[in-house]
């Protein structure tokens, strides 16, 4: 006797199957679609197919913002061109990963964003669905994040390089990678057998490093390492 196997659909945070041990199969998903469309006590449920991932929620949740796309969807706005899939779910061609925070905001009024999601991505979805209160909330969060980043104190690193007069011009002209010339100090001259005296200098250079709020500053580039190595030989 042949067994019937279900083809599972992937679950999404906040979507169908979340907290139920995995995704729903296509047959079960279609069955829930019929329940969502059946008149009576279950008619308050609405199914959404967002980028291939199914979400189940209530009309009350989707109608939190009367000016939003989702409100118009629930009201069957004739000016809104919306299709349904074979299970009766509304088709929305958007990223399901970023729809989770949007739907949860409509559910409980709080903005919760996982660490692996960017605020800008949530803002894009909030603007698409035209949820004005969420748009303002995400923009405030982005401004707060950027403000903290701009207030990170600067760290100045200084290096002292020793060079001869003939090397001085080339060293200063080729200096890059954020290093700036600060001071030049003459330390006399050196004598090499068979050659003329060479004036020697100490060249002081500096660089500004931003201390990252999430960890140490980035590794110096190759040119910076060369300057550091030359300074360490003093």
Swiss-Prot record:
Residues 211-234 are annotated as: Disordered. InterPro entries: BTB/POZ_dom, SKP1/BTB/POZ_sf, T1-type_BTB. It comes from the Eukaryota. The modification N-acetylalanine is found at residue 2. It holds the Pfam family BTB_2. Residues 44-146 form the BTB domain. Residues 220-234 have a biased composition (Basic and acidic residues). It is found in: Cytoplasm, Cytosol; Cytoplasm; Nucleus. GO terms for biological process: proteasome-mediated ubiquitin-dependent protein catabolic process; protein homooligomerization. GO terms for molecular function: cullin family protein binding. Homopentamer. Interacts (via C-terminus) with GRASP55/GORASP2. Interacts with CUL3 and with ubiquitinated proteins. Interacts with CRY1. This is BTB/POZ domain-containing protein KCTD5. It comes from Bos taurus. The gene is KCTD5.
């Amino acid at each position: 006797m042949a067994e019937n196997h279900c083809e599972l659909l992937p679950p999404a945070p906040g979507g169908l199957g979340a907290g139920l041990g995995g995704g729903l199969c296509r047959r079960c998903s279609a069955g829930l679609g019929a329940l969502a469309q059946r008149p009576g006590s279950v008619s308050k449920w609405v199914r959404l197919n967002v980028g291939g991932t199914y979400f189940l929620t209530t009309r009350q949740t989707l109608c939190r913002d009367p000016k939003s796309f989702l409100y118009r969807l629930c009201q069957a706005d004739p000016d809104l061109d919306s299709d349904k899939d074979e299970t009766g779910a509304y088709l929305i061609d958007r990223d399901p990963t970023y729809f989770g925070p949007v739907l949860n905001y409509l559910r409980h009024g709080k903005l919760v964003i996982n660490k692996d999601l960017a605020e800008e991505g949530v803002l894009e979805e909030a603007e698409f669905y035209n949820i004005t209160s969420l748009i303002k909330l995400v923009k405030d969060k982005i401004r707060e994040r950027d403000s903290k980043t701009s207030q990170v104190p600067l760290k100045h690193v200084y290096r002292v390089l020793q060079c001869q007069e003939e090397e001085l011009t080339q060293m200063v002209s080729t200096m890059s990678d954020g290093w700036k010339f600060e001071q030049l100090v003459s330390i006399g001259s050196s004598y090499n057998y068979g050659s003329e005296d060479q004036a020697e200098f100490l060249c002081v250079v500096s660089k500004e490093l931003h201390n990252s709020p999430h960890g140490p500053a980035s590794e110096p580039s190759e040119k910076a390492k060369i300057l550091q190595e030359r300074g360490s030989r003093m």
